[in-house]
Structure formats: C-alpha cells, structure tokens
Amino acid sequence: GYVKEIYHPDYVAKRMEIGAVMGAAPRRAVIRENSDPGDIIILLGGRTGRDGIGGATGSSKVHTEASIEVCGAEVQKGNAPTERKIQRMFRREEVSYIIKKCNDFGAGGVSVAIGELADGLRVDLDKVPKKYAGLDGTEIAISESQERMAVVVDPKDVDKFLGFANEENLEAIPVAVVTEEPRLVLTWRGKEIVNISRAFLDTNGAHQETTVEVEIPNKDGNLFEERPDVVDVKAKWLETLADLNVCSQKGLVEMFDGSIGAGSVFMPYGGQYQLTETQSMVAKVPVQNGKTDTVTMMSYGFDPYLSSWSPYHGAAYAVTESVARIVATGGDYKKIRFTFQEYFRRMTEDPKRWSQPFSALLGAYAAQMGFGLPSIGGKDSMSGTFNEIDVPPTLVSFAVDVAKIQDVITPELKKAGNKLVWLRAPRDQYDLPDYAGIMDQYEKLHNDIQAGKVVSAYALDRHGIAAAVSKMAFGNALGVKIEHNLDPRDFFAPGFGDIIMEVPADKVGQLSITYTLIGEVTDDGKFSYGNTAITEKEAEEAWKGTLERVFKTTSGEDNEKQAKDDLYHAENIYVCKHKVAKPRVFIPVFPG
C-alpha cells in the first residue's frame, strides 16, 4: 500500500481522507448482461443500521461547532471481516458467472444500490437484514451501512448463489424482484412507501444553472516565477528536508500493513535501511494458481499550495505529477488511466465561489486531452467550509497502470559513481505543461529504463531537486555531490513533472532523453554542493525530526533503566506436570 498525508493550514477547516484501490479479474469472467423481468435481487453481506444515514448529503454540508452533536449518524461503520468474506466469495469464478449485474452500497443505500439495477423494481424493505429493531422504512431505504452488495441473478440460480454465500458465512437474502413495469416501488410493512416512475428518475431532477466568475491567478503568488536568491544553501537544504510536506512520515506509514496478501513489490520505504520514500504503489496481481509477473501501479499527484494560487494549474500539474511518478517507476504512460478525487469549499450563489471547481476541472480536462488519457471515475465533496475557513481547492489525480515486474525500478540510489541527470518537463508561456514535449520525453525515458540505462528515478514536486536527491540517498546511506555550476535557484525550484535519474557513468551518453547532468552518487553519505557539505546525520535528523513527536518511530523506552516494582511476590511457583502446547503466535481478531 501507499500512505501519505498532505498538509496545508486551511485543512484545519476539515480534514479529508481519500483513497483508491485496484481490482483484477480474468477477461473471460467479465460479462455484461441486463436485468430481465422476474430476476431476483439478493442483498449480500452486512446488516443495515442507522449509521450512514444522510452521509451522501452530509458530505456536502457546511459544518459548525454543533456538527459533532448532530451529525453522528452520517458516519458509516466499517466491518473488515465481512468485507474480506465478500472479496473471497466474488473471487470464485463460478460465482461471477451467475451474477448478471451488481452494485455496492454507497450513497443512498438500498434506494440507490438496488434502484440502479433495473428499470422496474419491487423492493421489500422488511426482508432487509437489520442490526437492531426500530428502523422505519425511510431509514432502511437510505442507510449507507457498509459491506453490503446487491446482485441480480436469474431465479434458477438463487439457491446456488445462497449456497456459495453460506460457505463464506455471509448473510444473503432475496429482497427485490425485477418487474416489467418501469417503476421503482419500495414496500414496508405491507404498504407502498415509494412508487416512482423510472422516466421521472431518468430526468435527474430539475434543470439547474449557475453563473461562474473565474478568478485569474495573481502574478505575485506564481510558484514558477518566485525564485529568490539562496544565500545559505545548507540552511535552505535542511529547511526543505524539515518541511511538513517533505519530512519523513514513516511513523504514520508503519501503522498500516504494506505486506497484505504477500503481493507487494514496493514497500513504503525502500533501500537497505528502508528510508527512501517510494512514490508509487506496486503490487503483483493476485493469482490463485501458478505465478505471475504482471504488476499493478498506482500513484497520485497534487500540491495544495499550487492549487491555492491557481486551481487550473494545480489540477493540470496534479495529472502531470501522477503520470511522472508512474513513468519514474518504469511504467508506460500510454497505458495510464486516471481517477480524480475533488474537494472544494461550500458553494453558494456567489459566482466567484464557483471559480475554483470550474477552473480545476477545466485544468484536469485540458491535461487529459493533452496526454490523450481518460479519467474513468471520480468522486467529489463540496463541504470544505467550517465557519469562515475554506479548504484549499483540491483535485487529486490518481494514475493507474499495469506493467511487468522486470520493467519496474525502485527510487533509492544504487551505487557510488553513478551519475545524476535531470529531465525537465517543458512548459509553455503560461507556465502550463507542454504535453507534446512531455510525452516525447516520457516515451524516451520509458525506453531507456527498459534498456537498463536508468537504475533509479524520482519525480520532482514543489520542493525541487534538493528534496528528491536526499530522499533517494537515504535508503542505502549513500551521498550526493551536486555540480557546482548548477544554479542554487534551480536546485530548490518547483519541478512538477521533472524527473531525476540515476544512470551508470558508462551509459550517460547512451540516453535518448534531453537531460542536464547535475551530480554524482558518492559512498561517504555526505550531501555536498560547491562549498556546502551536509553530513548524513544532519540531513536525516532534519528529515526525521519534524513529525517524530506526532508519529513516533521509536518507543522511547529504555527497558534496562526501568525500575522493577513487583506488585506481588510468590514464595512458590507451581508448574503443571502435564505437557501442554506452547503457542508461539497470538492473533487477536476484532470484527468492526
């Protein structure tokens, strides 16, 4: 897995957790069928409760100090063991063949998850399994309780499907039937509480329009033009490593298991000392029999400070950055697909407040058209306002790709004597990505990686070369010597879309990309630039220290110095004379 927190002062308004996962299935198991009259809809998995009622609309509400008292029901409660059972059941090929259509229970609960499966439906809410008594029909219909699936099966396959569910100890109940008349009907306690025409639902409600007044970015805050002179390189370098969005988050990352399923190709931190932060999540496709060399790749791109200055630039470079990280890992950019997660301040009738989502989505659209790559999904929230505080305009781009494991490279520096080269992503006169130029360079870099000319690579962000080469070096305790003729302003300047590469000295001349030679890998652990030298200890202390008190990487306890204070002292110790098993592992399991 891959875990990362992004910091900006305005996220004090409301934090947001976003994530993405990838699934895989054999092509032969992918079927597209329609729901026919008489088909049965089965509710599979967890029970329904009051948790999650109003969650969909709640995600776009303004919150105040009183929200904690009145919004508790909007929060769903997960149930990981049930989720795992559903995954295991759906992985069975014979199960996939009898499912005609399926839907997960997200926003809107039963009314949406089941309501989307066919034009005509009759749903019996009394049959929906409940966590406890007392829920009325409306609550059952709109609850967003998690770990539930709705599947459409042929009547002759119902018993077979219920048998498969029973083998996984999953509750599965037929709750609805597909009807010929195109109406959505919900019944509760023998009465119809909803009876709506499908034609009416298909109108998507009343037509709405709004006026948008686009705010032009201020020249004064342009990150690309702000290139102040660097007076003290060492102080600036250490300050960069200590930045909240650069520093080590290893204490946080280690709270999550990066080895689930034994398919991880990249651990969150790489190198002999596990200190080089990886930029992509790479894992083998899980197979039940045999072995595979196919891997899935996922990366993200987003910078809150760039987006705060210009949502258009922020979204365009979010897409570009997510592509760059896949390319730096060895992926082929031409196979990438995106999914976007958006998060903006609360919209009102003020035309200027609509400027942020309008500009950001326009920038993301321009990037997709520029790369010729589509976004196949996304999710948004318009609730990022707390009283007078608004979150930064947020459009996070997730890029996904597939590759062969032998084509993937890791980001930590490999060997002293190798050269460091810099691929610059070309920009136009408006400081926007030159997509044609970038694609040309990324294509050449991909070929160079496959040819073994590049042994590690790192995509740059707002913090430039200094942060990237330092992180690359930490993993194997190597050093970096930067060319003295490199402009210090370039060393710390934002480099969205740029990539730093480690290349064996004898292969630098064979590169097909356009590059700048910026330095060399050393074995002394030092970071040097002209007359400036930073020891490995100084660099790591700056990088690790910022969040150590928040996300600890050491326990802070010295067992040898702990005073012994026996609460009870036994005169005699009694041992069972019969031999008993000695457990070596204790695994507690707590269903959520």
What residue spans do the PLM features occupy?
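Glycine/proline-enriched, intrinsically flexible loops and inter-domain linkers
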Residues: G1-G592
